[in-house]
Amino acid sequence: MRFDLEPPSSVAAAHRIGVLLINLGTPDAPTPRAVRRYLAEFLSDPRVVEIPQAVWQVLLRTLILPLRGRASAKKYAAVWMPEGSPLRVYTERQTDSVRHLLTSNGYHVMVDYAMRYGSPNISHALTQFKRAGVERVLLMPMYPQYSASTTATTFDAAFDALARMRNQPEVRTVRHYADHPAYIHALAEQVRQYWAQHGRPDFAAGDKLVLSFHGVPKRTLDLGDPYHDQCQQTGALLMAALGLSTTECRVTFQSRFGKAEWLQPYTAPTLREFGEAGVRRADVFCPGFTADCLETIEEIGMEVRDEFLAGGGTTFHRIPCLNGASAWIGALSEIVAENLQGWPVKAAQPEPVN
């Protein structure tokens, strides 16, 4: 292996600490070409699609990318913000807010973000940290619930980048925070604030709150992935915080891809069944997504909404993700701070003069 070129080591180096917030990724533009490039990287990850690569790559290159590239580009165009992709825009804002909050509390750390797929990538971010004199890095995936297809592959990419370094930094990882009290509080506050502005569902009349998490193939649960259980744990804690029963609130899973069985119940069919059963209002919230993106704005806000209304429902609400909510920025900063314990995160104070 050839290692990356590095400057000579120096005892006078900055010895800085870096916090890297890592999200899934996004195309650079809502165009078929950019979307195909992004999907090719994403769907080529063996952590994401556990099919023999020799077979999968033929299907991916000849069938899936040509068909999904153009269709997905139209969906991205429908949610694209003036500043860019929603996921990137919100992640940038979260990064700035966490940096500001930590700095205001006396933390002397660098805070940046990266994407597992697309740009800015993890390798580039770690290289920038190294050039700035960072010798300790906290990897903070923006996935509250652990899954091999999200959290583990994020760490894979980071360790691949570290493997090319001769002088590696000390590294810590945040595996999950599915049950962290500050995270649960931020979720509950997001729902409460939305209801304060738009009215609370009439649960006595049969209205429903649906907590929709991103789905994964069911076989991953059978193979030991803890994602399903952690989603259920988050859902139960959030229901308790909101004072709701399992009759009033349901955990579901969205974004199924392919014909294999995924975690159930599926979100869209559940909403249609609610409509057909006479449910008048349904609110959907996505606790596993810390920032709004295609899967929340388009899939939930448009496709799932249409399923509910087609089934006979009358009022649909998509509760925005945590995004830049103050409770979430506080929670995220708290989780980061807890995982920085033991490192010299605060600037050294001068010795008092006698």
Swiss-Prot record:
Name the species this protein comes from: Burkholderia cenocepacia (strain HI2424)
**Family per similarity comment:** Belongs to the ferrochelatase family.
| Protein residues bound to Fe cation | 214, 295
- What is the annotated localization of this protein? Cytoplasm
Its primary localisation, in coarse terms, equals cytoplasm
* Recorded catalytic activity of this chain's protein: heme b + 2 H(+) = protoporphyrin IX + Fe(2+)
Q: Does the keyword RNA-binding apply?
A: no
EC number(s) stated in the UniProt entry for this protein: 4.98.1.1
A biological-process GO annotation: heme biosynthetic process
Annotated metabolic or biological route of this protein: Porphyrin-containing compound metabolism; protoheme biosynthesis; protoheme from protoporphyrin-IX: step 1/1
Biological role stated in the UniProt entry: Catalyzes the ferrous insertion into protoporphyrin IX.
Name-wise, this protein is: Ferrochelatase
Which CDD domains has this protein been placed in? Ferrochelatase_C (cd00419), Ferrochelatase_N (cd03411)
Q: Which GO terms describe its molecular function?
A: ferrochelatase activity; metal ion binding
What PROSITE patterns is this protein classified in?
Answer: FERROCHELATASE
